[in-house]
């Protein structure tokens, strides 16, 4: 590969880069190098500075200090247009598409005429295993398909430096492997790839080099084969880290509106022959205290089903019963008042008020429950409680949530759902964009909530996560439930086979 040629200068050379926001140092004298044909993994906890560093490289932010070189040439006053011209393309964690333009128009947007090659676009789609309709609007795509469109935009621009920020967060294992195949082909062509991920097994599978950021500095850097998983996790996690969560007592959760603490065999949520946009004839039930996994490939109908249960989409037919009473005729706010709470897949467009404060966001579902007036002091007290237990990093209490890192935004969204006192909690990709140090806390938190007899529907594209968390899993394929597995039956390989419709095992007895 090209990076074996020592005469070739680095594609990217960052020296002494520093950056601060509102007096807070977010980058401290960063050194980072990317060679041609190199896949360099970048890891770090939420708020470690990864996204800020990548925005500087992509020309979105300007450094306060330091030197940036592209292919051996010093570059200053970099902006996104100039970055694209230099072959730098950033694929963000949250897709930034034009919702009213078609998929094809988004891919080709602002592409120089000599690079507009529709046959190449179709070939790349085939290599990625994508079944995207190029003529539908981007607003109709789910998060995973939006991410694939962003990846296509970068590939169509013949980028020399490709930055991928959590590209597999909403992809299934099969889709992830197809992406990795394409990235390896780009690597052979001399493209340098910066790969940001919280999934350490992916890093060992794909990358040759690794750098770990912590508190705005580089804590570890070198060839990945020289480091163990434990060494990488230790570099990510500060030495003086918080103690593990100690049940809901430490959270101080008030689940008075939730079901009785006495375990019950009677389902709290029953769905019968439910059909809607993207799914049909869905029947299942979930009991208090049960974690019911919902797995399937992108486009299987999981998110559409969740949004229909919550009332965001209309049901075509079938019945939804919460606490033995039909909620078909209830609006979303009424279902919420009955204890049905939904944590959406796309936190920025559906879950959070980006210009509002952190405390206001956490309490936003309950502001009108007990009083007409908003109570800033109460919001602040709630914020402080969750920040201590979920290790949410922020500068000040009135800070807009849009200024937080992606992982910290996700933690605020989880806190918002918990503050609504759920009886049934539907969580769609709960650890998307959350670092390895925080995932275990979130897993533990979800289990503690289930132990208080809250029913949880757990939707995730990370099948290892589903196997780890779920008591039972329903596997969807093309809008239908293609299989059900008990805890003893489930493993990643079995779920994948069912998700792709290869076989349909005997249904479990309890449904």
From Swiss-Prot:
CDD domains: ABC_Carb_Monos_I, ABC_Carb_Monos_II. Residues 12-240, 263-503 form the ABC transporter domain. Keywords: ATP-binding, Cell inner membrane, Cell membrane, Membrane, Nucleotide-binding, Repeat, Translocase, Transport. It is found in: Cell inner membrane. Its EC number is 7.6.2.13. It catalyses: ATP + H2O + (2R,4S)-2-methyl-2,3,3,4-tetrahydroxytetrahydrofuran-[AI-2-binding protein]Side 1 = ADP + phosphate + (2R,4S)-2-methyl-2,3,3,4-tetrahydroxytetrahydrofuranSide 2 + [AI-2-binding protein]Side 1. InterPro entries: AAA+_ATPase (IPR003593), ABC_carbohydrate_import_ATPase (IPR050107), ABC_transporter-like_ATP-bd (IPR003439), ABC_transporter-like_CS (IPR017871), P-loop_NTPase (IPR027417). GO terms for molecular function: ATP binding; ATP hydrolysis activity. It is an enzyme of class 7 (translocase). It comes from the Bacteria. ATP binds at residues 44-51. It is a peripheral membrane protein. Its main location: membrane. GO terms for cellular component: plasma membrane. The complex is composed of two ATP-binding proteins (LsrA), two transmembrane proteins (LsrC and LsrD) and a solute-binding protein (LsrB). Belongs to the ABC transporter superfamily. AI-2 autoinducer porter (TC 3.A.1.2.8) family. Part of the ABC transporter complex LsrABCD involved in autoinducer 2 (AI-2) import. Responsible for energy coupling to the transport system. NCBIfam families: PRK15439.1 (NF011967). This is Autoinducer 2 import ATP-binding protein LsrA. It comes from Photorhabdus luminescens (Xenorhabdus luminescens).
């Amino acid at each position: 590969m090209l990076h074996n040629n020592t005469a070739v200068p680095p594609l990217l050379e960052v020296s002494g880069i520093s950056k601060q926001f509102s007096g807070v140092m977010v980058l401290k004298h960063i050194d980072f190098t990317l060679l041609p044909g190199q896949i360099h993994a970048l890891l770090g906890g939420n708020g470690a500075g990864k996204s800020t560093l990548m925005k500087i490289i992509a020309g979105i932010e300007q450094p306060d200090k330091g030197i940036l070189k592209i292919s051996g040439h010093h570059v200053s006053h970099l902006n996104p247009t100039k970055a694209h011209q230099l072959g730098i393309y950033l694929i963000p964690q949250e897709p930034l598409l034009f919702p009213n333009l078609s998929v094809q128009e988004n891919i080709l947007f602002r592409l120089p005429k000599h690079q507009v090659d529709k046959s190449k676009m179709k070939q790349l789609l085939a290599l990625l295993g994508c079944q995207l309709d190029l003529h539908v609007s981007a607003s109709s795509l789910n998060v995973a398909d939006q991410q694939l469109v962003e990846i296509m935009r970068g590939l169509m621009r013949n980028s020399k430096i490709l930055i991928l920020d959590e590209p597999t967060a909403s992809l299934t294992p099969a889709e992830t492997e197809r992406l990795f195949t394409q990235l390896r082909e780009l690597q052979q062509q001399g493209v340098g790839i910066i790969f940001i991920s919280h999934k350490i097994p992916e890093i060992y599978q794909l990358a040759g080099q690794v750098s770990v950021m912590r508190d705005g500095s580089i804590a570890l850097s070198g060839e990945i084969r020289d480091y163990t998983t434990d060494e990488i996790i230790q570099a990510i996690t500060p030495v003086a880290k918080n103690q593990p969560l100690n049940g809901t007592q430490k959270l101080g959760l008030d689940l008075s509106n939730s079901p009785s603490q006495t375990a019950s065999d009677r389902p709290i949520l029953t769905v019968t022959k439910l059909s809607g946009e993207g799914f049909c004839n869905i029947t299942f039930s979930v009991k208090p205290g049960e974690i019911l996994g919902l797995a399937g490939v992108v486009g299987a109908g999981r998110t559409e089903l969740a949004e229909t249960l919550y009332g965001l989409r209309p049901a075509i037919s079938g019945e939804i019963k919460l606490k033995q009473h039909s909620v078909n005729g209830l609006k979303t706010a009424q279902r919420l008042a009955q204890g049905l709470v939904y944590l959406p897949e796309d936190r920025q467009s559906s879950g959070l008020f980006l210009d509002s404060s952190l405390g206001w966001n956490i309490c936003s579902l309950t502001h009108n429950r007990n009083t007409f007036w908003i109570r800033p002091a109460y919001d602040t007290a709630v914020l402080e409680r969750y920040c201590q237990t979920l290790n949410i990093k922020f500068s000040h209490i009135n800070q807009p949530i849009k200024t937080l890192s992606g992982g910290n935004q996700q933690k605020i969204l989880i806190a918002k759902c918990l503050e609504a006192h759920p009886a049934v909690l539907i969580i769609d990709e709960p650890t998307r964009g959350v670092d390895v140090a925080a995932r275990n806390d979130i897993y533990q938190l979800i289990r503690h909530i289930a132990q208080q007899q809250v029913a949880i529907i757990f939707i995730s594209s990370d099948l290892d996560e589903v196997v780890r968390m779920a008591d039972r899993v329903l596997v969807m394929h093309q809008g239908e439930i293609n299989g059900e597995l008990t805890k003893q039956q489930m493993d990643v390989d079995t779920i994948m086979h069912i998700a792709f419709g290869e076989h349909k095992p005997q249904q479990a007895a309890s449904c």
